[in-house]
Amino acid sequence: MVFVACGLNHKTAPIHVREKVALQPAMQDSLLSSLLDLPEVNEAAILSTCNRTEIYCDTNTPEVLGNWLAHEHQLSEELLSQFLYIHQGKEGIKHTLRVASGLDSMMIGEPQILGQMKQAYQHACRLGTVKTQLRPVFEYIFRASKRIRTRSGIGANPVSIAYAAVQLIGQLFKNYHSLSVFLIGSGETASLVAKYLHQHGVHRFLIASRTLENAQKLAETFDGKTLSIGDIPQYLPLADVVISATACPLPFINKSLVEHALEQRNHAPMFLLDLAVPRDIEGNVNELEQVHLYNVDDLQSMIEKGMDERRNAALQAEQLIESELDNYIRWHRSLRAKDVICDYRNQMHTLAQQELQRALKKISAGQNQQDVLNEFSMRLVNKLTHNPTIGLRQMAWDNREDLLDLARYLFDTTANQSLYEEIS
């Protein structure tokens, strides 16, 4: 088997090229089937995201992949070749490990790519385009990339405002499930924070927007309650977390409003995230006890620190990839002996069963058990060593000292001799 990773990504191709070769879900089955129709391709899976389209396959002629991609997407082969990369064998495994570990992502260490690769693999398995050759390779890559991410900590530090906000909320409130979140405004970042919180188990959302239609859409997404901007004073005491991102020219959440909400909450802690510029929440709100107010600048400093830490983690992850790559090479080489080992063990098992059945029949017939066991052990030793003995004699006749040395290593005769000397 020759493992090949072929494709293009955000580093090698502009978006107007990437979007032309992006794999639409409705096309997935037909494209995989078309790829497997190529006589040169034995097995394959296709990963397609907004930042990359990659083919992972077993083929001895990887040049057919670029031709196939160009034909399927009605592109010039000459044009596509400018953006295409092809990694074979060890380099193909290394590239795929880097992708799965998040090292090749636009945002270093992002976790989504591993899940996307697993989905692509599972779909190919269901379709039957990944079988015995690629299956163990993918399973190894998934295990190895998980170890790399865990040991390097590459995904541990926030590198987006939304992710940083969710981490801060998690530090203040240990249980996401019990939180009530008040979302004011319907901007992209605020919605993304709400999405992440929902994924972490938050189920109670209050949503207010100057445009009622936008609030209703978000409420449907998160199964929340739709409110108007005028409802904020009434419902603010119910919120453990407030995320505000409107386009108001002046702050509309002031210290007295939050202080009143705290009194009604019996001074239970509140987390306020102001994503608006200009700000929606007055800065002196942070003077109140049990109030944790963060704005965009606060989160940006966290992100810059997180990026530095991720870059350091990426250096460690690259070293871990080299180690995992060595492990893969050893594992893959060991597969070449798998059939020989299996056949040899089956042969030995068959011989042992034959001799065991012969001995049991003699014991059932009333023969002396000790005599039968002695004969059994002698016959078993003779049968197990018959073929190796013939081979060793042939090596000696042919003056193949190199093979005799190999036999000494395989049979570990030196160790056995030392053992016999200790026993005697």
UniProtKB/Swiss-Prot annotation:
Which residues are catalytic?
50
* Enzyme superclass (EC): oxidoreductase
State the pathway, as annotated in the record: Porphyrin-containing compound metabolism; protoporphyrin-IX biosynthesis; 5-aminolevulinate from L-glutamyl-tRNA(Glu): step 1/2
Is Methyltransferase among this UniProt entry's keywords? no
Catalytic activity from the UniProt record: (S)-4-amino-5-oxopentanoate + tRNA(Glu) + NADP(+) = L-glutamyl-tRNA(Glu) + NADPH + H(+)
A Pfam family name for this chain?
A: GlutR_N
Q: Which UniProt keywords apply?
A: NADP, Oxidoreductase, Porphyrin biosynthesis
Site description Important for activity, residues in chain: 95
Instruction: Report residues binding NADP(+).
Output: 185-190
Q: Which GO terms describe its molecular function?
A: glutamyl-tRNA reductase activity; NADP binding
Q: What is its EC number?
A: 1.2.1.70
Q: Would you kindly state one Gene Ontology biological process term found in this protein's UniProt entry?
A: protoporphyrinogen IX biosynthetic process from glutamate
Subunit-level organization: Homodimer.
Report the sequence similarity comment from the record: Belongs to the glutamyl-tRNA reductase family.
Q: Domain remarks in the entry? A: Possesses an unusual extended V-shaped dimeric structure with each monomer consisting of three distinct domains arranged along a curved 'spinal' alpha-helix. The N-terminal catalytic domain specifically recognizes the glutamate moiety of the substrate. The second domain is the NADPH-binding domain, and the third C-terminal domain is responsible for dimerization.
What does this protein do, in the record's words?
A: Catalyzes the NADPH-dependent reduction of glutamyl-tRNA(Glu) to glutamate 1-semialdehyde (GSA).
What extra comment accompanies this record? During catalysis, the active site Cys acts as a nucleophile attacking the alpha-carbonyl group of tRNA-bound glutamate with the formation of a thioester intermediate between enzyme and glutamate, and the concomitant release of tRNA(Glu). The thioester intermediate is finally reduced by direct hydride transfer from NADPH, to form the product GSA.
The name on file for this protein is Glutamyl-tRNA reductase
